[in-house]
Amino acid sequence: GGLIIVDGSVGQFVGYGMRGGDILVRGNSSGRLGASMKGGRIVVLGNCGSILPSFTILEIRPTVRIGEERIKGPFYLFQGDLNEGGSGRLFIAKASNPQLIALERYLEA
């Protein structure tokens, strides 16, 4: 797959129906990241709004490598879109998304 780098912010539905490749968003997202995605990775360094309920949180990663760049985190790692049987990955910068901290309780189980 290829790599798309967005040096600013994006609207809704980034990566809709995505099957592979990588998208790096250096700014914010208006939400609904990865709707209907089946594969690939989306990395958001800014605020992402909310995560679709068809994604599950897997872990917190200290870094993410995208293209030739290793980006320091930490990052929340989500998998989905489970409604589509997808195995796409969302890497969401923890520092920019305090609204997601409540999801960490699902990691302790």
Provide a role label for each language-model segment.
Residues 5-7, 12-109:
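Intrinsically disordered, low-complexity terminal regions
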